C-alpha cells in the first residue's frame, strides 16, 4: 500500500498508474472469491450441508463486497475521465482498500462486534458522578495493552489533557495582567472608559474560557473512549487492590516479612493518613506485610480497627521475631519504619514515583498518576466498619447532600499564619461561581449547591449570610469540634471523616492544597472517577505529598528571560517545580543551570517518575 500512496503525487500523470493499482486490487479480490468458491465446491456434500450453506453465504457476501469495489472503481474511472476526482477522495478509497488488506477479519464474511459490545462490563453511568461498581477480579496483565480501533493512543490522551490545562493557564495570565491594569486605572491613572473596556475584556474572556472548557468536556464524553476509560480504570484499580490484599494476607504470617508502622505521628488526621499511606507504599515496594500499630491512637484510643477495617484479615502483629530499624537488610524479618521526614536512606519509590509496570497504562488513563496511585492505598485503608458506614450514610441524608455539588474546604485556625495564608470566603466562591457558569454555558440553569467544610464554624455562617442564592450544606457543630482544642475526640474524628468523604464525592473541589485534608479528599476523589485530575481549584499550592522526592517538569518550549526574575529554558531541560503563582507563571529551579526563578507554566509538561517495584506475578 506504500506504493499506492507514493503514486498519489501532485502530478496528474499519476492517475493512470493509480488506476492500474486499483484494477489489480479488484482482480485480487475476485481471485480470493474464486479460490474460496472452488474450495467450497471441492468438499463432499454428504454430512456437510450446513457447513456448505455457510460457506456459500460467505462467498455471496464476498461477491457482494467485490461488486461494491467494482462499482467504486468504475466511479473512479468516470471521475478520472472527467477530471473530477480530488486527491482526498482517492486517498479515502486507498484507505478502505488498505484496511481490508490489513484487517481481513473486518471483511463482510464475519461481521465484527459493535464498539459498545466490547465493553459490556462498563458501568451504565458514564458521567463519572458515581463510583465505578466493583467488578470481578480481572486477569489483565499490568503491561500496556495493545490499543486497537476503540482505544485512544497515549499521545491523544496526553494532548487532550494538556489542552485542558493550558486553557486555564492562558486565562490565569490574561486575568492577572488585565487585573493589574484595572487597578491602576481605578487609582486614577487612566480614564473611566478604559476601566470599563478592561472589565469587558475580563468578562468576555471568562465566558470564552468557560466555552472552551465546556467543549473539552463534550469532546471527552463523545470521543468514543469513555467506556474504555471506565473499564481501564476499573481493571487497574482491581489489579492494585488484589495485590494489596495478597500482600496483607500472607499464607504464613509467622514467617512472613513485616513492616511496622506506628500511627501516632504528631500531627492532624490528614497528615496521619498520609503517614500510613507512606508506610503502605514502602511495604508494597519491599514486599512486606504492613503491621499498623494504632492502639492509643490520639483520635480514637481503641485503635484504627474500630473505625476502619483491619489492614489484614490474618496477620495483625509482628510476632516474636527481633525488630530492626530502617533500612535493615532484605532478610530482616521485622522492620520498623520512621516518619518520612527522617527516612535515611531515601528510596526512589517514594512519592512522586509510580510503579514502572503500571506507568504506561496510568499515563494514558490519568492526568496525574501519583494522585491515582496514592488514592488506591486510601481506597484499601479507608474501608469503613459497619458503624462508620452507617454514620456516613445517615450524615449524607441528614445534610441533604445531592448532586451537582461543589466541595469547598476552608482551613483556618492553626494553619493560618504559619503554613498558609488566610483566604476570604469571597475568594473561594469566585471559583465556585465560575464552575457553575461553565455548567450553564449551553443555556441551562443549574441549582447552585456547595458542601462547605471548615475548622471554623463562623465560615459556614458567613457564607450563608453572603450567598443566599446558594444552598450551602455544612454543619457548624462539626466545624467547632474541628478546632485545635477539641479535634482529638471521637466526635471530632467522625466529623472529619464525614467532611473528607463528602468533599471527595463532590463534582469539583475548591480548597487550599496546603491543607492535608483537602489533598486527602482530592486523592480519594480519584477512586470515584476514571480521571479526576482536573476537578479542583487550589487557592495556594499545587498538589504535593509531604516528604516527596523532587517534583520535576520537562521543558517542551524554550523560554528567553523577559525580566531578571525569569528562568532561561531550553527544550529538554528539567525544572524542579516549587509552585504555581496561578497567574500564568510557575516558580522553580532549572536543574541544568541550577538557577531559580519564574517561567511560563505552559512551556513545561509533567515528568512522570517511575520506580521498579515488585510485579506480584500471578495476582
Swiss-Prot record:
Record topology, Lumenal segments: 39-619
Motif (SH3-binding): 345-351
Cofactor binding annotation: May also use Ca(2+). The enzyme has substantial activity without divalent cations.
Compartments it resides in: Golgi apparatus, Golgi stack membrane
Residue intervals annotated with topology Cytoplasmic: 1-17
GO terms of biological process kind: GDP-L-fucose metabolic process; N-glycan fucosylation; protein N-linked glycosylation; protein N-linked glycosylation via asparagine
Enzyme nomenclature, EC number: 2.4.1.68
Function: Catalyzes the addition of fucose in alpha 1-6 linkage to the first GlcNAc residue, next to the peptide chains in N-glycans. The addition is prevented if the GlcNAc residue is already fucosylated.
Protein name per its UniProtKB record: Alpha-(1,6)-fucosyltransferase
Name of the coding gene: FucT6
Amino acid at each position: 500500500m506504500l506504493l499506492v500512496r507514493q503514486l498519489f503525487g501532485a502530478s496528474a500523470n499519476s492517475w493512470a498508474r493509480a488506476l492500474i493499482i486499483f484494477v489489480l486490487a479488484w482482480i485480487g479480490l475476485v481471485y480470493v472469491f474464486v479460490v474460496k468458491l472452488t474450495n467450497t465446491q471441492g468438499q463432499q456434500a454428504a454430512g456437510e450441508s450446513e457447513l456448505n450453506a455457510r460457506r456459500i453465504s460467505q462467498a455471496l457476501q464476498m461477491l457482494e463486497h467485490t461488486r461494491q469495489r467494482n462499482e467504486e472503481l468504475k466511479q473512479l474511472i468516470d471521475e478520472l475521465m472527467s477530471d473530477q476526482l480530488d486527491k482526498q477522495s482517492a486517498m479515502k478509497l486507498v484507505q478502505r482498500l488498505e484496511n481490508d488488506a490489513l484487517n481481513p477479519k473486518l471483511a463482510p464474511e464475519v461481521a465484527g462486534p459493535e464498539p459498545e459490545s466490547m465493553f459490556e462490563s462498563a458501568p451504565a453511568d458514564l458521567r463519572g458522578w458515581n463510583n465505578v461498581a466493583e467488578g470481578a477480579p480481572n486477569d489483565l496483565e499490568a503491561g500496556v495493552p495493545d490499543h486497537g480501533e476503540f482505544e485512544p493512543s497515549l499521545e491523544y490522551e496526553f494532548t487532550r489533557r494538556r489542552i485542558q490545562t493550558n486553557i486555564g493557564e492562558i486565562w490565569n495570565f490574561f486575568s492577572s495582567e488585565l487585573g493589574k491594569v484595572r487597578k491602576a486605572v481605578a487609582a486614577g491613572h487612566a480614564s473611566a472608559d478604559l476601566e470599563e473596556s478592561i472589565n469587558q475584556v475580563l468578562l468576555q474572556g471568562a465566558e470564552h474560557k468557560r466555552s472552551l472548557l465546556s467543549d473539552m468536556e463534550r469532546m471527552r464524553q463523545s470521543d468514543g473512549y469513555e467506556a474504555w476509560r471506565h473499564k481501564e480504570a476499573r481493571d487497574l484499580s482491581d489489579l492494585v487492590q488484589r495485590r494489596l490484599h495478597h500482600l496483607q494476607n500472607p499464607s504464613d504470617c509467622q514467617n512472613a516479612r513485616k513492616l511496622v508502622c506506628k500511627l501516632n505521628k504528631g500531627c492532624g488526621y490528614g497528615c496521619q493518613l498520609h503517614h500510613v499511606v507512606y508506610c503502605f507504599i514502602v511495604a508494597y515496594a519491599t514486599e512486606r506485610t504492613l503491621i499498623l500499630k494504632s492502639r492509643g491512637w490520639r483520635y480514637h484510643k481503641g485503635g484504627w480497627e474500630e473505625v476502619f477495617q483491619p489492614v489484614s484479615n490474618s496477620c495483625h502483629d509482628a510476632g516474636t521475631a527481633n525488630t530492626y530499624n530502617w533500612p535493615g537488610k532484605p532478610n530482616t524479618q521485622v522492620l520498623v519504619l520512621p516518619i518520612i521526614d527522617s527516612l535515611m536512606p531515601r528510596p526512589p519509590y517514594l512519592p512522586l514515583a509510580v510503579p514502572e509496570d503500571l506507568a504506561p497504562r496510568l499515563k494514558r488513563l490519568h492526568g496525574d498518576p501519583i494522585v491515582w496511585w496514592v488514592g488506591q492505598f486510601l481506597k484499601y485503608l479507608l474501608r469503613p466498619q459497619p458503624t462508620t458506614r452507617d454514620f456516613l450514610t445517615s450524615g449524607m441524608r441528614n445534610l441533604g447532600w445531592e448532586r451537582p455539588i461543589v466541595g469547598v474546604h476552608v482551613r483556618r485556625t492553626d494553619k493560618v499564619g504559619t503554613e498558609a495564608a488566610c483566604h476570604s470566603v469571597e475568594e473561594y466562591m469566585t471559583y465556585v461561581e465560575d464552575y457553575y457558569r461553565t455548567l450553564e454555558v449551553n443555556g441551562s440553569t443549574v441549582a447552585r449547591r456547595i458542601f462547605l467544610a471548615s475548622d471554623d464554624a463562623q465560615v459556614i455562617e458567613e457564607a450563608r449570610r453572603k450567598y443566599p442564592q446558594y444552598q450551602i450544606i455544612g454543619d457548624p457543630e462539626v466545624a467547632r469540634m474541628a478546632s485545635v482544642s477539641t479535634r482529638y475526640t471521637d466526635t471530632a474524628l467522625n466529623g472529619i471523616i464525614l467532611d473528607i468523604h463528602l468533599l471527595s464525592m463532590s463534582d469539583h473541589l475548591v480548597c487550599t492544597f496546603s491543607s492535608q485534608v483537602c489533598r486527602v479528599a482530592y486523592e480519594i476523589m480519584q477512586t470515584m472517577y476514571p480521571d479526576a485530575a482536573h476537578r479542583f481549584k487550589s487557592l495556594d499550592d499545587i498538589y504535593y505529598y509531604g516528604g516527596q522526592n523532587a517534583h520535576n517538569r520537562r521543558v517542551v518550549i524554550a523560554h528567553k528571560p523577559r525580566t531578571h526574575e525569569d528562568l532561561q529554558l531550553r527544550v529538554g531541560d528539567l525544572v524542579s517545580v516549587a509552585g504555581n503563582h496561578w497567574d500564568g507563571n510557575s516558580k522553580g529551579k532549572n536543574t541544568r543551570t541550577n538557577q531559580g526563578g519564574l517561567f511560563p507554566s505552559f512551556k513545561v509538561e509533567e515528568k512522570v517518575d517511575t520506580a521498579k517495584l515488585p510485579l506480584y506475578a500471578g495476582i
